[in-house]
Design a protein with these regions (language model features):
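N-terminal beta-alpha supersecondary unit
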Residues: 1-29
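Short active-site-proximal "capping" loops at secondary-structure junctions
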Residues: 2-4, 35, 122
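Oxyanion-binding and handling regions
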Residues: 6-7, 61-136
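Short amphipathic alpha-helical face segments that pack within enzyme cores
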Residues: 8-11, 47, 51, 68
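Generic helix-packing signal
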Residues: 20, 52-53, 73, 129
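Phosphate-handling active-site elements
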Residues: 20-25, 54-65
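DPxDG-like acidic metal-binding loop motif
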Residues: 29-60
């Protein structure tokens, strides 16, 4: 029987620590994704992070998918993360982290203040481009 992602998670963590040459004792904080995203995947990640936090006696902190995707970006950015039923979770960054859920098609009105034309394209970060949607 093949191992699933949940069963492989701790092996992947071990491999990442080995490649980075970091001992578990040096870990000071566990950071875990809290969504939006696949519900089962988020639950597995939270359970694994909580287990690591307890076993290593270190604090745990959650970060949402938009904060993780857009971390370190200074300009106006958009993340579009696929959701179920042909929906996307849209998130923007321009000093805050607003999140919106919209069907494929026109973007929420909150994007009206985005940069226009080439400046918008240059500064755009879109995730989940496997589906078509319009930001006009």
């Amino acid at each position: 029987m093949k191992k699933g992602q949940a069963e492989l998670l701790f092996e992947v963590i071990e491999d990442a620590l080995k490649q980075a040459k970091i001992e578990k004792t040096r870990i000071e904080l566990i950071v875990v994704g809290i969504g939006p995203g696949n519900f089962t995947g988020i639950r597995i990640g939270l359970a694994a992070a909580k287990g690591l936090s307890l076993s290593l006696k270190v604090p745990i902190s959650g970060v949402n998918s938009f904060q993780a995707s857009l971390y370190g970006q200074n300009d106006y950015k958009i993340a579009a993360i696929p959701a179920r039923q042909n929906l996307h979770y849209f998130g923007t960054i321009n000093g805050d982290f607003k999140t919106n859920l919209t069907k494929d098609g026109p973007a929420p009105k909150s994007f009206a203040n985005r940069p226009k034309g080439k400046e918008f394209i240059k500064n755009m970060a879109i995730f989940g481009a496997d589906r078509k949607f319009s930001l006009s």
